[in-house]
Curated annotation (Swiss-Prot):
Keyword Ribosomal protein: yes
Family that this chain belongs to: Belongs to the universal ribosomal protein uL22 family.
PANTHER family in the record: CHLOROPLAST 50S RIBOSOMAL PROTEIN L22-RELATED, LARGE RIBOSOMAL SUBUNIT PROTEIN UL22M
Biological classification of the source: Bacteria, Bacillati, Mycoplasmatota, Mollicutes, Acholeplasmatales
Protein name: Large ribosomal subunit protein uL22
One Pfam family per UniProt: Ribosomal_L22
Quaternary organization: Part of the 50S ribosomal subunit.
Keyword field contains Ribosomal protein: yes
GO biological process terms held by the UniProt record: translation
Amino acid sequence: METKKPKAIARKVSIAPRKARLVVDLIRGKNIAQAQAILTFTPKVAAPVILKLLNSAVSNAVNNLKLNREQLYVKEVFVNEGLRLKRMFPRAKGSGDMIKKRTSHITLVITSSTNLQTSKEEEQSGSKN
């Protein structure tokens, strides 16, 4: 049986997924203190949103699952494309172009380093099929 993993999801964030992925790639695999420091000093629009999401996931882990804050790290974080809002941009001679305002769904999963060690031990002790 798989243990619960604390996670947080931000949906319909009005940031293009391509721009959000630049920030997300910086914190993948880092411990929580490092990730918060990186996000605090990253001059990208997506950084404050992802920092807020990281703090939410840490709070979920500490309050709901009683995990130790110092042992947490970012296990997986990814950005999926959300809705595209289509807007008209007027051009010359009465024509117009379509502007796609892209949104993102950002998912962040954290885990404890002790959970990682026990899952590796279970994999090694298990038999191969």
